[in-house]
């Protein structure tokens, strides 16, 4: 390229059209801290808009990051009135789905019901599927127009703190997977619907009507996920071989889904060159990190490559996230920002 992209996420934070931001990467690389930092900066830079941060990771670390308990319903972050968080529980969603299924037909020998259970159970990443449906349900309940009640919320952007890489990619496959599944259900409705109604399955039509509505929502979201004006993916990694390898694999797969990805956040960097008295281990590790950073700079020259420092403590609480997240917009400089990092470590 003839020019180097700025090493920040400024373009994402300032982009007016973004509706969805996915944050993902290998386990243990700082996805939750990064997604929380992005959400905090969005909220700070756009105080008149509402934002929602959702964890689809079964480990659920948002409560730890903000030092505040979150659950399956969106809850405001203390200290940031325009940011809400929620943690989706796939197991609870599965239980709800099983209970709802009973209302349509209590006959365990119903062949259509048995077939549907088999098909549902064969979805790759059923827990992610249920998480996805939970997100759709919640967003739809929150979406408002001019005639809705004023106490309802319309979110400008929704940020996903995703599960480790493999789960993330299955989650992103779900729109197309669910579309195929629902198409099969619709085909069954055409073939067996009249017969099931004659046999007393009057509720079958209601079920298929709901499935049609779900398919419409899934199709709409799928179109948004592949629109770079509406959706982007932020990769998170550390400067090590396995993490770099996983990041490249993930980027290639995201591109196969036609998803926009042009930003990489590299966490846990030592910057030992600027340390007055670095230990031998720090120097050795920094040399290793620098080797892979140089490879990333060459491999991802057309990406925003954001370098975040390693701290001696965890980043927890809104105030600490506000300080740390600044480095997503202004590149970290050890000589300039050293005191800020020290203050974060002392808390």
Curated annotation (Swiss-Prot):
Localization in the cell: Cytoplasm; Endoplasmic reticulum; Golgi apparatus
Enzyme class of the recorded protein, top EC level: hydrolase
Binding site for ATP: 26-33, 240, 267
SUPFAM superfamilies linked to this entry: P-loop containing nucleoside triphosphate hydrolases
Enzyme Commission code(s) on record: 3.6.-.-
Known partners and oligomeric status: Homodimer. Component of the Golgi to ER traffic (GET) complex, which is composed of GET1, GET2 and GET3. Within the complex, GET1 and GET2 form a heterotetramer which is stabilized by phosphatidylinositol binding and which binds to the GET3 homodimer. Interacts with the chloride channel protein GEF1.
Any Pfam family the entry gives: ArsA_ATPase
A GO term for molecular function: metal ion binding
Single biological process term from Gene Ontology: tail-anchored membrane protein insertion into ER membrane
GO cellular component: GET complex; Golgi apparatus
InterPro entries according to UniProt: Anion-transp_ATPase-like_dom, ATPase_ArsA/GET3, ATPase_ArsA/GET3_euk, P-loop_NTPase
Keyword list, A-Z: ATP-binding, Cytoplasm, Endoplasmic reticulum, Golgi apparatus, Hydrolase, Metal-binding, Nucleotide-binding, Transport, Zinc
Functional note: ATPase required for the post-translational delivery of tail-anchored (TA) proteins to the endoplasmic reticulum. Recognizes and selectively binds the transmembrane domain of TA proteins in the cytosol. This complex then targets to the endoplasmic reticulum by membrane-bound receptors GET1 and GET2, where the tail-anchored protein is released for insertion. This process is regulated by ATP binding and hydrolysis. ATP binding drives the homodimer towards the closed dimer state, facilitating recognition of newly synthesized TA membrane proteins. ATP hydrolysis is required for insertion.
Residues of the active site: 57
Family per similarity comment: Belongs to the arsA ATPase family.
Record's protein name: ATPase GET3
Binding, Zn(2+): 279, 282
